[in-house]
Amino acid sequence: MKNFKGRKFLTCVLVSLCTLNYSSISFAETQAGHANDITKNASSIDTGIGNLTYNNQEVLAVNGDKVESFVPKESINSNGKFVVVDVRKNHLQRHQSIFRLLDSVANRTYPGAVQLANKAFADNQPSLLVAKRKPLNISIDLPGMRKENTITVQNPTYGNVAGAVDDLVSTWNEKYSATHTLPARMQYTESMVYSKAQIASALNVNAKYLDNSLNIDFNAVANGEKKVMVAAYKQIFYTVSAELPNNPSDLFDNSVTFGELTRKGVSNSAPPVMVSNVAYGRTVYVKLETTSKSKDVQAAFKALLKNNSVETSGQYKDIFEESTFTAVVLGGDAKEHNKVVTKDFNEIRNIIKDNAELSFKNPAYPISYTSTFLKDNATAAVHNNTDYIETTTTEYSSAKMTLDHYGAYVAQFDVSWDGFTFDQNGKEILTHKTWEGSGKDKTAHYSTVIPLPPNSKNIKIVARECTGLAWEWWRTIIKMNKMFH
């Protein structure tokens, strides 16, 4: 009986040892398998993104408007004036790597966000590549913070990153703002408006936004009824940067595979990019609009933007009297975007100058961002090519010419000019006109007024005097050619 009990006890011990040994082996195999999966997933992401075939310039190329045919010139009579509409085809080519940030895309353009470099990205309406992420380091360039300028975001979603940025800014405001000042970083761009594609490329902003916020009448611009310039003032308070990965897989959780990324849109035509930095500050968009037909409108608007005293000089008084100015502000202490419409440009200047310093009451606003390709950390740049029509309208008024002969001799006058119009193809048509009194003798004192239509050009005046000399009976004393009205 004792031997039986001993054998039974030994058997139980052996079974227990076998069970423990089997469990240990199973756990070790599970751990090893998990490690292999992590390595395999990371390798699949790095290899998959590395093997994507695309050209950085071509994948983000934007071919805008194409202008095939147009009438180069036409003329109309309006309110006693002759109006010439001059139409020219221009081509604009720009490469932009800094994208203006709008409300509608703020939750897709935060530091560290992963996007798809496709047509939506080129249109500044990027799509997010949503997948589980690893922790991400972000840093801010506010002065004086040293090692406190960086924070780790455990789960870098839009909300978590925005909160981390707020923490960094709050730290600066509480500890360093009193002893450190921000350098002034104001960027300024301006352009005349000719078409949606042209102004979007020129100012690097979505045309729909400009259309909605500034109410640009593109049809009136195209018809020559209005002339519009838009200026963008961008003041950067600080920039937040996301740490660039050594490998694409450094951004994604160990459970993420390349297959998951491709299911969510990654392809040769939509390679992944990461928002590497976001600039925070404020932007002021200014629209200068006029119904003036003067050829000096662009010069007048440029002078107004750069010279505080140009209004008082009177040089462009007529243009400014027919103009209105609109300003839209993004950022600063306004809870909503301010919009001001005025005829007094000093109000616009005050808006630009006000709220120019970062503080608790005057927070920064995300205004622009830069993205980099995950494949090689190259900067993502959109390459815009677009044709656009530049329309210039010129008004001509009627005029009068006074002939006054008071010399003690017989005189003759020859006066002629060309009336010009344009046919349906924009080709100029000249009709030669001659004053009815041309070539007739006039004795002193003779005076008359010759009306000149508003579409007169190539005005010629010849005056002759009768000398009484047989060898030179008539002598030319005035000859004016190629005078343009």
Swiss-Prot record:
One of its GO terms (cellular component) is membrane. A motif (Conserved undecapeptide) lies at residues 465-475. The chain crosses the membrane at residues 196-209, 216-225, 294-303, 311-323. It is a multi-pass membrane protein. Pfam families: Thiol_cytolys_C, Thiol_cytolysin. InterPro entries: Thiol_cytolys_C, Thiol_cytolys_C_sf, Thiol_cytolysin, Thiol_cytolysin_ab_sf, Thiol_cytolysin_sf. SUPFAM superfamilies: Perfringolysin. Keywords: Cytolysis, Hemolysis, Host cell membrane, Host membrane, Lipid-binding, Membrane, Secreted, Signal, Toxin, Transmembrane, Transmembrane beta strand, Virulence. It is found in: Secreted; Host cell membrane. GO terms for biological process: killing of cells of another organism. Belongs to the cholesterol-dependent cytolysin family. A cholesterol-dependent toxin with hemolytic activity against host red blood cells. Causes cytolysis by forming pores in cholesterol containing host membranes. binding to target membranes, the protein undergoes a major conformation change, leading to its insertion in the host membrane and formation of an oligomeric pore complex. Cholesterol is required for binding to host membranes, membrane insertion and pore formation; cholesterol binding is mediated by a Thr-Leu pair in the C-terminus. Can be reversibly inactivated by oxidation. This is Hemolysin. It comes from Bacillus cereus.
